[in-house]
């Protein structure tokens, strides 16, 4: 797996969708993945308004962040995942997150969902957005 970019941030829904779509085309991605726990169907509806042709996978978190992150952490430990470039905020979250971390690790969450979504798809390239 290759992490080619980190486009995470605090955006309005419209800006988030536009950024995700731009990344989808820029990196020739297979699909956009988003956690639906907070946005539900709204994310897909906003995406379809902007571009009905972009493939989308919604994921609903059923386990805690630590349990979701453990398999991805193992992939990095086995040297099966690589960052192409330096992603300061993402790397800081990856190195500092504990069960007691107060601030939600948005960038780490995106990375975990990205790699988890690709594990069974056969694709090894993903852009975080």
Positions of PLM-derived features:
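RNase H-like, metal-dependent nuclease domains and their acidic two-metal-ion catalytic environment used
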Residues: 1-59, 81-129
């Amino acid at each position: 797996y290759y992490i080619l970019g980190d486009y995470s941030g605090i955006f309005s829904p419209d800006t988030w969708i536009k950024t995700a779509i731009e990344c989808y085309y820029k990196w020739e991605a297979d699909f956009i993945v988003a956690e639906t726990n907070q946005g539900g169907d709204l994310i897909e509806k906003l995406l379809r308004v902007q571009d009905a042709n972009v493939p989308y996978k919604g994921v609903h978190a059923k386990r805690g962040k630590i349990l979701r992150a453990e398999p991805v952490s193992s992939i990095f430990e086995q040297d099966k995942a690589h960052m192409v470039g330096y992603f300061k905020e993402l790397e800081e979250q990856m190195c500092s997150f504990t069960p007691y971390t107060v601030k939600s690790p948005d960038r780490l969450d995106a990375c975990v969902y990205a790699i988890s979504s690709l594990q069974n798809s056969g694709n090894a390239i993903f852009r975080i957005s």
